[in-house]
């Protein structure tokens, strides 16, 4: 089946002209949904055909078969059962596929009325894409599921790019301006499952590196979706308002991104409209800038191998609700830069630490909170069931209990606002759902039985009739068994025959022994080992049961719709209450964590201070405790301004391999992040002057797919740091200059230290094995030497994992090599070579360089030139218009420029 018709050839005129009626319908629907696998409903299965079938069978690991021929080719086919469709959708979505779900929208009996060859009407009811999921099975309860739109407007004084992101499962809708420089960092911060972009922009070479990194997450869409001229009207129509003035002020490029996101939601949800919150604008300056390399190196929400276990988020997470877990992850990805907002969060955590019984009471109550935002979204999109209504009911009940627990004290601002939002939840809705819904709820509304007995007296009567009839059937079975003497006689039911009497083939003669018996027991079906009969009274009873059951279900479904309508009308209050519960969950979980792990409250302000006493690595410390491997060795770090200066310090860290340099670097970056999300930190004391940008170049990696070696990746990331770090930034660099010749590496590291000190003027930690760099501390006033301490004992090296002042004179690489198991002969030869190299170095010590080289003068001079603005020659060149000059005028101008350069 290798020769398969492609979608392009499938939708040709020749293809349609030769197709059967059913296949013609399929081709038409497929043509309207390019780029998506088409789940085509046929009875109890979703079928896929042609190249969709080949692709899906490979991705799902299901059998590929065929269904006839088309245009002389076999038609590949595979299918999945409707009842298990969510499981298969999940696999496809995880692999980055998009699926168009095509349902039968009329009863087959209606189609037959139009003629024997008529095809059942079908249409796509939904496009399932990674960024527009709502089903519980397809979503992680602890992770947001964002759809993002990227827009760009050229020739505008406004920011060139904007991002809008929506989680239709919770109603979150946010937008922000960005720049090309920070575009990828902002995308990674939000971590969308799907990013839509205008097709013209998708093929822009300037953005090719961004889309290469994103892979299948980025999806081109028609440029018309991003038209800023109609953006405001599109958003206003979605929210059913005449003006967006009540939402705030947005730039043109922000509106273009927001409108594209809304248009894509409408496109994928067909006729349904999820209850989105009003768009909220985020300022780039309000969050800590963390570039993609730093996020990966620090393993904030997942490890370098892609696992959640072992990440900072995994070490922090003590939340007990899905909403709380999502909010904690969101905060960790976007630390704040406003000390006032940070301290408001810290106040809430401190309040709950001080009142242990309150914290424990809240956490116990929060364990019963259901995921109201996601249940609300499914109900609004008509994908919800009775259990979603039950989730709203349970959430409202729990919220009321939590409000009672929290009420009564003088609460900090964050908890006080949460309490107000909980009190604003609709009590009448809670009472209505409590009185209507049964305790045990079915998954699907079509199963019925979700209304409480007593909620509707008329329904109770119909149910009694239905249930009584079923008891009558049990009585009939006993009666017929006695009449015939067949003890094994059973009354059964299926969707084809309805209720019927079944006896074994050996007992069938008794049922037809006399004319009277034949008249009473009417033969219906002969099976291999059994025969089936019915009676007039059984048929009458079946009719009554069917009517009663149908009537009961109709009444329940009508009540279901009324309850859904009541819930959706309170969508804003429910979402606000759910957010309040998430805020309380995060605050109480961080309080619990701080008590459990002995964290301290950091001082966070607008100063340039960076002082940590007894700091610890939050992830490594917990790992050591789990392994009973002894305590984590705490260390101090002080990068505060030196001698009353206004710029922070840089530590040059030397020491042995395995001494703990990388751990020390990372732990200080993580402590800064924890402080700025509003968490207590693993230290005895900490004072963090807000960091605006965090850069980390730790660990080695390559990018072979893009033709970049480990050294090239290191240089690219270092270049980004040196070009973007400000005086308020925190920079941690580990072993810059590896992977090239020794002198090349030393030179690069040397120049990088100078640049960080004199141009960036940032706070930083610079770990290196180039001990020659330690002499820089004699000339660079804010540079201090620090080292990882070790002890030597009888030829062995003992790593103390302690940081102290001073410089290491050795890296102990040979000792580490011996510990790793290198052959003894290799280790001994390495010692001999090292001795010779050290003797040579003593004859030309690096300390001479400090006097021979004009340290950092080039960097300073270039910085001064850049700040001074354009020269007279540059100004003159700007004023020239060559098209309007005669040859003589051009020559005179050239002489004038030469004269000006001579003066310079």
From Swiss-Prot:
Q: Which PROSITE patterns did the record assign?
A: DNA_MISMATCH_REPAIR_2
The Gene Ontology biological process annotation of the record reads:
mismatch repair
Q: Which domain of life is it from?
A: Bacteria
Keywords attached to this Swiss-Prot or TrEMBL record, sorted alphabetically, are:
ATP-binding, DNA damage, DNA repair, DNA-binding, Nucleotide-binding
Please tell me where ATP binds in this chain.
Answer: 655-662
What do the Gene Ontology cellular component annotations say?
A: cytosol
Q: Which GO terms describe its molecular function?
A: ATP binding; ATP-dependent DNA damage sensor activity; damaged DNA binding; mismatched DNA binding
Pfam families per record: MutS_I (PF01624), MutS_II (PF05188), MutS_III (PF05192), MutS_IV (PF05190), MutS_V (PF00488)
Fetch the InterPro entries from UniProt: DNA_mismatch_repair_MutS, DNA_mismatch_repair_MutS-lik_N, DNA_mismatch_repair_MutS/MSH, DNA_mismatch_repair_MutS_C, DNA_mismatch_repair_MutS_clamp, DNA_mismatch_repair_MutS_core, DNA_mismatch_repair_MutS_N, DNA_mismatch_repair_MutS_sf
What function does this protein fulfil? This protein is involved in the repair of mismatches in DNA. It is possible that it carries out the mismatch recognition step. This protein has a weak ATPase activity.
Concerning PANTHER family, the annotation shows:
DNA MISMATCH REPAIR PROTEIN MSH1, MITOCHONDRIAL, DNA MISMATCH REPAIR PROTEIN MUTS FAMILY MEMBER
Q: Which family does it belong to?
A: Belongs to the DNA mismatch repair MutS family.
What is this protein identified as? DNA mismatch repair protein MutS
Which source organism? Agrobacterium fabrum (strain C58 / ATCC 33970)
């Amino acid at each position: 089946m290798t020769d398969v018709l492609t979608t392009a050839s499938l939708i040709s005129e020749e293809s349609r002209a030769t197709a059967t009626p059913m296949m013609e319908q399929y081709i038409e629907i497929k043509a309207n949904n390019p780029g998506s696998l088409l789940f085509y409903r046929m009875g109890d299965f979703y079928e896929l055909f042609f190249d969709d079938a080949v692709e899906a069978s490979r991705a799902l690991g299901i059998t590929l078969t065929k269904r006839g021929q088309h245009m002389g080719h076999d038609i590949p086919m595979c299918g999945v059962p409707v009842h298990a469709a969510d499981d298969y959708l999940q696999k496809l979505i995880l692999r980055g596929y998009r699926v168009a779900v095509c349902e039968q929208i009329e009863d087959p009996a209606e189609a037959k009325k139009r003629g024997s060859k008529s095809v059942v009407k079908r249409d796509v009811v939904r496009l399932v894409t990674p960024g527009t999921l709502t089903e519980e099975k397809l979503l992680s309860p602890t992770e947001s599921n964002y759809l993002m739109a990227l827009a760009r407007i050229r020739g505008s004084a406004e920011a060139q790019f904007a991002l809008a992101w929506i989680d239709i499962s919770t109603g979150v809708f946010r937008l922000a301006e960005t720049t090309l420089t920070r575009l990828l960092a902002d995308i990674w911060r939000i971590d969308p499952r799907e990013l839509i972009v205008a097709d013209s922009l998708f093929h822009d070479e300037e953005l090719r590196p961004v889309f290469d990194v994103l892979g299948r997450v980025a999806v081109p869409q028609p440029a018309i979706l991003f038209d800023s001229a109609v953006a405001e009207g599109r958003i206003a129509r979605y929210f059913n308002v005449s003006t967006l003035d009540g939402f705030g002020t947005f730039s043109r490029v922000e509106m273009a991104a927001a409108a594209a996101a809304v248009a894509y939601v409408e496109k994928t949800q067909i006729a349904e409209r999820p209850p989105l919150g009003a768009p909220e604008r985020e300022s780039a300056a309000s969050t800590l800038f963390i570039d993609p390399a730093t996020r990966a190196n620090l393993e904030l929400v997942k490890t370098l191998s892609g696992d959640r276990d072992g990440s900072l988020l995994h070490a922090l997470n003590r939340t007990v609700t899905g909403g709380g877990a999502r909010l904690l992850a969101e905060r960790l990805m976007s630390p704040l830069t406003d000390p006032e907002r940070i301290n408001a969060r810290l106040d809430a955590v401190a309040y709950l630490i001080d009142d242990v019984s309150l914290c424990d009471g809240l956490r116990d109550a929060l364990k019963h909170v259901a995921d109201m935002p996601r249940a609300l979204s499914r109900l609004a999109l008509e994908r919800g069931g009775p259990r979603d209504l039950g989730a709203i009911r349970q959430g409202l009940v729990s919220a009321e209990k939590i409000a009672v627990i929290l009420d009564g004290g003088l609460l900090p601002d964050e908890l006080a606002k949460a309490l107000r939002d909980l009190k604003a939840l609709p009590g009448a809705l809670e009472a209505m759902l409590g009185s209507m819904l049964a305790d045990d709820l079915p998954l699907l509304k079509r199963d019925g039985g979700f209304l409480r007995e007593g909620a509707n007296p008329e329904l109770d009567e119909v149910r009694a009739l239905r249930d009584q009839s079923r008891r009558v059937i049990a009585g009939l079975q006993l009666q017929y068994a006695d009449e015939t003497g067949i003890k094994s006689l059973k009354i059964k039911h299926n969707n084809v025959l309805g209720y019927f009497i079944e006896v074994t083939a050996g007992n069938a003669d008794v049922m037809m022994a006399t004319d009277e018996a034949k008249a009473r027991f009417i033969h219906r079906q002969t099976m291999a080992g059994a025969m089936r009969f019915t009676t007039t009274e059984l048929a009458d009873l079946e009719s009554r049961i069917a009517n009663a059951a149908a009537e009961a279900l109709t009444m329940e479904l009508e009540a279901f719709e009324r309850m859904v309508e009541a819930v959706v009308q309170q969508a804003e209050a429910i979402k606000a209450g759910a957010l309040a519960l998430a805020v309380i969950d995060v605050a109480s979980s961080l309080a619990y964590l701080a008590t459990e792990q002995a964290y301290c409250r950091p001082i966070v302000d607008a100063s340039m201070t960076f002082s940590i006493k007894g700091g610890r690595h939050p992830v490594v410390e917990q790992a050591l405790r789990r392994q009973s491997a002894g305590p984590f060795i705490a260390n101090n770090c002080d990068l505060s301004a030196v001698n009353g200066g206004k710029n922070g310090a840089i530590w040059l860290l030397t020491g042995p391999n395995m001494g703990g340099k990388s751990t020390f670097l990372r732990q200080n970056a993580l402590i800064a992040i924890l402080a700025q999300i509003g968490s207590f930190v693993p230290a005895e004391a900490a004072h963090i002057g807000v960091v605006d940008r965090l850069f980390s170049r730790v660990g080695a990696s390559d990018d072979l797919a893009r033709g970049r070696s480990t050294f090239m990746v290191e240089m690219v990331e270092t270049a980004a740091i040196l070009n973007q770090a400000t005086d308020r930034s925190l920079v941690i660099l580990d072993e810059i200059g590896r992977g090239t010749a020794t002198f090349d590496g030393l030179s690069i590291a040397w120049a990088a230290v100078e640049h960080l000190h004199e141009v960036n003027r940032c706070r930083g930690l610079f770990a290196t094995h180039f001990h020659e760099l330690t002499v820089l501390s004699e000339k660079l006033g804010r540079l201090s030497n620090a080292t990882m301490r070790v002890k030597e004992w009888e030829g062995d090296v003992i790593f103390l994992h302690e940081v102290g002042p001073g410089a290491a004179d050795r890296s102990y690489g040979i000792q580490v090599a011996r510990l790793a198991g290198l052959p003894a002969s290799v280790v001994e030869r390495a010692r001999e070579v090292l001795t010779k190299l050290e003797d040579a170095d003593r004859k030309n010590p690096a300390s001479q360089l400090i006097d021979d080289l004009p340290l950092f003068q080039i960097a300073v001079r270039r910085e001064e030139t850049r700040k001074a603005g354009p020269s007279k020659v540059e100004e003159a060149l700007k004023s020239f218009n060559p098209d309007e000059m005669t040859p003589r005028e051009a020559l005179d101008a050239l002489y004038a420029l030469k004269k000006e350069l001579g003066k310079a």
